[in-house]
């Protein structure tokens, strides 16, 4: 808004100039805006020129424009500052990232340098340790070699009493035990262990004591054997080079007996060539002197002689080259010092601490011509004071010597000991051709019992004890790995094959089902449903049931067809011979009663039908089909006859309705016709009689009727009975049955009937009310219905069921006494309607319907109608 005071006080000239400038500026700005917006500037200029703007308005516009410019400039400056800040931040981040990368590289370099220095130091330490170990090992080897050389140089003298020998013995024991265990053992057992008991010039006695031998492993023995180079500076004393080889097994435990002149030598194969002096043949005394003189010469020669330790030479090659030592038999005075004696002693373990030398299996030690020790199987020590060596002793020694490498080789295989066999072949020089040419044939002794290899001994479990069970043998065979020794595997297979493995057979126990069935068939008449057979180990229970049901069904169909065929034949015969049948049935029981017995006999033996072959069953089924066709034809014929009879009855009833005046005379004739027709219908089935009797239900309503109760045990009538009809109690009065008259008979068959039976007519529905109480009393459809008496009902037909004795015994095979409703007859007709012969016939006649198999579910029922013997009169 413009300020009025400011406009009034300002001068006109200054105001006009300023106004013009402002107008020009505004126009320029407006034109620029129009150019920007695309609006025509001329129209706008005309309009503005027409309306001159006010000064206050122009001032405000300028202020706003200037403020806007300032704001825009500030914004541009702020944006520029922001861009600068962002650039600076980016530069700083780059610099920081570069610094971090440099630090990482530097750290990695430092870590690598540290690792390298650590590896270098570890390598230096390892090398130093290895060098120290090698130095220690070399020092140990050098000490052992020095000890060996020192001990070999000690033996310079020979004594008849064996003092030097003892020193040499103990020294060699110390020499050969190069480990710390041997040094400890030497400290525990000094050299003074072997002492002379009696030092006499003629006899030398020794005290044998047990020496604890260290247990060496094969690696220790090999390492010590490789660097052990024994020198041959030991002189030959009295023909015997006392270099004995001993085999130390890895499994050696306990104490080892040491003979006085036996050494334990670890190198497995040592071949030493010893030059022998010329042969001396002098007296015993001169021989002893010469022997003492030649000891120094021999030792000097041995120092110059080359000693070879042949580790790579196999055992068999050494034995082949020197199979037999050359020993010359001399006189008792002379001794051949150049003879090569090979001593191979096998040291075994003796657990007993006794001082017997039995633990040595072989040992031959010759000390001198004076003292000769022959350690044979019994290791007997023979010390002779004479100055002669027996040739027999030499022979025994050589035999034992040749035998020892063989057993050493056998034991090295079995006990996994050092592979090299200890063998020392002391070869004589070729200066004595006579000794080389002469060879003594040595006989190898039989191996003693203690040196039979362990795998040849039969196990105590296989020989001494009772033989194990084959199941345990199979289990051990599965658990144990196969033995590498072939003999043990053969022995195990022999012991396992010597027993026959008898597997346990699961014998199925089949019970005596025939006996059980025979006992159950005695009550087959009482129980209509037969139990199934027991399991005869057939494939499955369902298959057995199906097969059994099919077989029984086939047997049932066959029996049914047979019975129908018999019934048809009987009906034909009875129709043909009606008067004869009437005469016979007055005196005899009908033959049809035997048919149920036949059915029962067939039911008693179902195993016969079950055991019949399939071909017989097929033939029976074919016969049954043909019989079914015949039975259908006969059923159609019977149906036609029944229709004719029904028409006849209807005509009679119509006549009775029409002529009630002459009812009595007509009824007599009708009754006679009824009796004849009933006899014709009876064989075809008892159903037609019930159908005929049901026709009279419509007439039963016209006259009062009575209900008669029969006792179950006896056929007597209960007089004192109260009957309730819909809540009303009525006393039933019964007269003597002798004066009662038969008014009708009726029976009810089962609801289940095959399709061959005739269909009921409409008239049967009238009697359905009388049957309902019987169905409620007995649910089983297979019942035998007996019409015992004829009853008059006072009101609606009512039925009372009573159980007989058979029902008490078996509820399934019950016979129900049925008093069916009967048509009402005139009182005049009842007095003379039925003749006496007819009542007798009806009393004895049992009319059988279709034969029924009570045990089969498809069986139908047959009814038996029994009538009273005399006519019965009932009160009206």
Swiss-Prot record:
GO cellular component, one term: spindle
Primary localisation category: cytoplasm
Modified-residue entries (Phosphoserine), positions: 417, 483
UniProt KW keywords: Coiled coil, Cytoplasm, Cytoskeleton, Phosphoprotein
MF terms in GO: microtubule binding; tubulin binding
Family classification: Belongs to the MAP7 family.
Identification of the protein by name: MAP7 domain-containing protein 3
Organism: Mus musculus
This protein's encoding gene: Map7d3
């Amino acid at each position: 808004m413009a300020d009025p005071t400011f406009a009034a006080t300002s001068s006109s000239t200054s105001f006009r100039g300023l106004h013009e400038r402002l107008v020009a500026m505004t126009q320029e700005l407006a034109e620029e805006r129009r150019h920007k917006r695309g609006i025509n500037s001329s129209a706008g200029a005309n309009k503005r020129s027409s309306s001159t703007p006010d000064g206050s308005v122009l001032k405000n516009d300028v202020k706003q424009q200037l403020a806007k410019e300032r704001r825009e400039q500030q914004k541009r400056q702020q944006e520029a500052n922001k861009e600068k800040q962002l650039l600076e931040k980016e530069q700083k981040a780059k610099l920081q990232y570069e610094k971090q990368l440099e630090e990482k590289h530097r750290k990695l370099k430092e870590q690598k340098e540290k690792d390298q220095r650590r590896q270098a130091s570890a390598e230096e330490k390892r090398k130093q340790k290895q060098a120290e170990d090698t130095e220690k090992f070399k020092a140990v080897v050098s000490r052992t070699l020095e000890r060996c050389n020192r001990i070999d140089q000690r033996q310079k003298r020979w004594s008849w009493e064996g003092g030097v020998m003892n020193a040499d013995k103990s020294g060699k024991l110390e020499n050969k035990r190069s480990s710390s265990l041997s040094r400890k053992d030497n400290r525990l057992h000094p050299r003074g262990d072997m002492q002379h008991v009696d030092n006499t010039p003629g006899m030398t006695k020794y005290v044998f004591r047990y020496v604890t031998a260290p247990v060496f492993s094969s690696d220790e023995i090999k390492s010590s054997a490789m660097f052990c180079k024994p020198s041959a500076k030991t002189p030959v004393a009295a023909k015997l080079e006392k270099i004995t080889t001993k085999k130390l097994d890895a499994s050696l435990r306990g104490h080892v007996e040491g003979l006085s002149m036996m050494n334990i030598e670890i190198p497995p194969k040592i071949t030493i060539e010893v030059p022998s002096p010329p042969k001396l043949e002098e007296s015993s005394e001169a021989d002893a002197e010469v022997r003492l003189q030649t000891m120094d010469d021999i030792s000097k020669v041995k120092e110059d002689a080359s000693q070879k330790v042949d580790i790579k030479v196999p055992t068999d090659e050494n034995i082949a080259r020197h199979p037999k030592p050359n020993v010359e038999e001399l006189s008792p005075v002379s001794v051949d010092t150049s003879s090569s004696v090979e001593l191979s002693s096998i040291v075994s373990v003796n657990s007993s601490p006794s001082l017997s030398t039995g633990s040595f299996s072989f040992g031959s030690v010759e000390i001198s011509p004076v003292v000769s020790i022959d350690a044979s199987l019994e290791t007997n020590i023979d010390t002779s004071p004479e100055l002669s060596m027996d040739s027999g002793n030499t022979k025994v020694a050589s035999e034992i010597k040749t035998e020892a490498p063989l057993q050493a080789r056998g034991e090295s295989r079995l006990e996994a000991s050092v592979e090299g066999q200890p063998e020392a072949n002391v070869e004589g020089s070729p200066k004595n051709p006579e000794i080389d040419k002469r060879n003594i044939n040595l006989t190898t002794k039989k191996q003693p019992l203690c040196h039979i290899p362990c795998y040849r001994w039969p196990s105590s479990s296989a020989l001494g004890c009772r033989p194990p069970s084959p199941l345990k043998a199979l289990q051990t065979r599965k658990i144990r790995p196969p033995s590498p020794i072939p003999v043990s595997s053969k022995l195990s297979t022999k012991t396992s094959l010597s027993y026959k493995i008898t597997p346990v057979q699961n014998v199925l126990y089949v019970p005596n089902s025939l006996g059980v069935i025979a006992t159950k068939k005695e009550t087959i008449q009482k129980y209509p449903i037969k139990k199934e057979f027991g399991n005869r180990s057939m494939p499955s229970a369902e298959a057995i049931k199906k097969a059994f049901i099919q077989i029984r069904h086939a047997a049932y169909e066959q029996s049914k067809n047979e019975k129908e065929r018999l019934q048809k034949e009987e009906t034909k015969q009875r129709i043909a011979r009606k008067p004869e049948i009437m005469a016979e049935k007055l005196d005899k029981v009908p033959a049809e009663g035997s048919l149920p017995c036949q059915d029962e006999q067939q039911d008693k033996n179902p195993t016969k039908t079950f055991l019949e072959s399939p071909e017989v069953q097929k033939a029976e089924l074919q016969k049954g089909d043909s019989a079914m066709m015949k039975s259908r034809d006969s059923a159609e014929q019977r149906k036609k006859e029944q229709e004719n009879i029904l028409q006849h009855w209807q005509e009679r009833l119509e006549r009775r309705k029409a002529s009630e005046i002459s009812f009595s005379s007509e009824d007599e004739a009708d009754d006679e016709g009824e009796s004849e027709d009933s006899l014709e219908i009876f064989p075809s089935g008892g159903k037609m009689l019930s159908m005929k009797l049901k026709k009279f239900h419509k007439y039963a309503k016209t006259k009062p009727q009575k209900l008669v109760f029969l006792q179950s045990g006896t056929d007597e009538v209960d007089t004192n009975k109260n009957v309730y009809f819909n809540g009303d109690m009525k006393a039933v009065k019964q007269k003597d049955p002798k004066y009662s008259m038969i008014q009708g008979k009726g029976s009810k068959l089962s609801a289940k009937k095959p399709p061959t039976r005739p269909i009921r007519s409409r008239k049967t529905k009238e009697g359905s009310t009388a049957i309902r109480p019987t169905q409620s009393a007995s649910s089983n459809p297979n019942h035998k219905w007996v019409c015992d008496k004829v009853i008059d009902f006072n009101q609606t037909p009512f039925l009372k069921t009573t159980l007989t004795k058979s029902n008490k015994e078996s509820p399934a095979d019950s016979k129900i006494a049925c008093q069916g409703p009967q048509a009402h007859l005139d009182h005049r007709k009842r007095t003379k309607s039925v003749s006496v012969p007819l009542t007798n016939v009806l009393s004895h006649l049992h009319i059988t319907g279709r034969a029924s198999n009570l045990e089969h579910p498809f069986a139908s029922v047959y009814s038996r109608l029994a009538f009273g013997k005399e006519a019965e009169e009932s009160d009206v």
